[in-house]
């Protein structure tokens, strides 16, 4: 019963995907964060931490800080670090860790599916955090951390996923935390339409 929506992703060039990808800013210890920012001009950490080694500082979570994030994001795009998909697509992401393999589909979801109870939130968010995130989205116009949703096992969805993961991924790289990241692009209209139908018929 859920709507899944294809979209035109803005994503790294294949040749620098491993250098651009990063964990969330807050998960790095200070010395590791500084080393990455100093040694890697491609890391996305420069976008989410645009004031590194800068004297002109702004308040965290302020509009001024988010404007700097937006400016750095636009700079990365102008330098050719990112590319935008030519047509609406869905994506398969597989994360392989020492603890297991996790595979899912990246796509858009409809906000009204949360409002009408089809997508069930796992927690309520503090109003202050909601206001901050709204300001961030209004200012930056992008969101880099997907929301994780689960769904009941479905053989038809699994069949489409299996077909793609047997092909060469668009991205495949392993990070220092022993995790391997792979991404496949679903741009076949037939496969996208079938996935939309399958998700529409899932139990909520």
Predicted segments with their positions:
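A cross-family signal for N-terminal binding/gating loops and helix N-caps
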Residues: 1-203
């Amino acid at each position: 019963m859920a709507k899944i929506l294809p979209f035109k992703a803005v994503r790294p060039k294949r040749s620098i995907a491993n250098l651009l990808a990063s964990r969330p800013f807050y998960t790095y210890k200070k010395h590791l964060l500084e080393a990455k920012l100093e040694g890697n001009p491609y890391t996305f950490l420069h976008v989410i931490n645009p004031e590194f080694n800068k004297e002109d500082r702004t308040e965290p979570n302020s509009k001024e800080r988010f404007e700097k994030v937006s400016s750095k994001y636009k700079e990365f795009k102008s330098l050719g670090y990112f590319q935008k998909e030519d047509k609406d697509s869905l994506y398969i992401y597989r994360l392989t860790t020492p603890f297991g393999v996790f595979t899912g589909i990246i796509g858009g979801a409809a906000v009204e599916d949360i409002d009408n109870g089809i997508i069930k939130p796992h927690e309520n968010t503090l109003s202050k955090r909601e206001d901050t995130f709204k300001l961030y989205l209004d200012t930056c116009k992008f969101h880099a951390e997907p929301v994780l949703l689960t769904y009941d096992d479905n053989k038809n969805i699994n069949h489409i996923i299996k077909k793609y993961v047997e092909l060469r991924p668009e991205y495949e790289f392993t990070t220092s935390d022993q995790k391997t990241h792979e991404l496949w692009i679903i741009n076949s209209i037939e496969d996208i339409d079938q996935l939309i139908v399958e998700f529409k018929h899932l139990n909520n």
